[in-house]
Amino acid sequence: MASDEPFSEKLRVPEALTFDDVLLRPKESRVEPDAADMTTRVSTNVTLNIPVLSAAMDTVTESELATEMARQGGLGVLHRNMTVEQMVEEVEEVKRADELIIRDVVTASPDQTVREVDTMMEREGVSGAPVVDDDDTVLGIISGTDIRPYLEVGESDLVREAMTDEVITAHEDVTPRQALELMYEHKIERVPIVDEDDHLTGLVTMAGILARREYDSAARDEDGSLVVGVAVGPFEADRAQAADEAGADIVFIDCAHAHNLDVIDTAREIKAEVDADVVVGNVGTREAAEEIVDFADGVKVGIGPGSICTTRIVSGSGMPQITAVAEVADVASQHDVPVIADGGIRYSGDAIKAIAAGADAV
């Protein structure tokens, strides 16, 4: 777009600051480090226990790191340099980790042989399985301990002969504490979850409960599963929908320059099509924030501040990160939209400076 502004006037730029340009001014405080509350919203509906996200880079975040990030209270954002099918598997891998009620339960039939069930459990990596009929009614439970004697003398015997038919079950509203008490009282390691008709709906295991107790500060969704984010391109609506259906909590519109009207239009369309929160980025100015805060669940800030990012070198475009965060936060805070500072964080102090400038997470 043509401008009547003289070229020389364009050089009269306002001051803009980055991390090395500022320090926090010390002030009086009674807050001890271990008493600090670091919980923060990273999007409209997702709260973290620490304000830290991992980068959506193919050398950084896949399901393993995303799982550990959520266990520590943060958020892992899966990169998009993979097929949609691989992405779905990665999301599901995070969601399965540490879940209290296992939904994808490995089950046995009473008419299978002991050898068949032993092979199945070895293949699926489980040490026991509920025994159900064709209607998923729980008839019993079978474990490696039940099977072991039969493998020596009667591996063709049926599961109904080897299973434990006195099954301790629980309903959907069971708490981790209640499930643990059931296991302790009855000396068992797994409790099938059933509906009012005794149909199997899930399974709680001792290992799952202990894993959850180990990570008591983990960031979880309303079902108790670990939270996970997924990066998608601005024109990848199909990938965004697949991520949403797989259970992703946040879809990140991943673009080097999100202050592009086509990007904003497609981001708005994606937001209308998915149930997950949608975070839009990256932007670096007040004007960009004004274009997206009316629909975005979060805004990601950073035009080339990263140590290996070449955006500023290649395009000659960018904004010093402290000023960029502050400008975007001025707008986003008026709409209760969280701000994420993306890039340029070299030291822990830089993260603190970004938060002081208005970021909710880094």
Question: Where in the sequence are the language-model features?
Answer:
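The conserved cystathionine-beta-synthase
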Residues: 56-58, 108-125, 132-133, 151, ...
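Catalytic cores of alpha/beta
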Residues: 64-66, 238-246, 283-301, 341, ...
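Catalytic beta/alpha-barrel core
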Residues: 77-81, 107-108, 128-130, 169-171, ...
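N-terminal capping/small domains of soluble enzymes
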Residues: 1-117, 122-124
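Active-site-adjacent beta->alpha loops and helix N-cap segments on the catalytic face
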Residues: 34, 83-92, 152, 199-219, ...
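Short beta->alpha transition motifs characteristic of CBS
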Residues: 78-83, 126, 130, 138-153, ...
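Glycine-enriched alpha-helix->loop->beta-strand junction motifs that scaffold or abut catalytic
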Residues: 70-75, 245-251, 273-276, 294-298, ...
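Short beta-strand/loop segments at the ligand-binding rim of alpha/beta enzyme cores
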Residues: 47-52, 100-105, 221-231, 269-284, ...
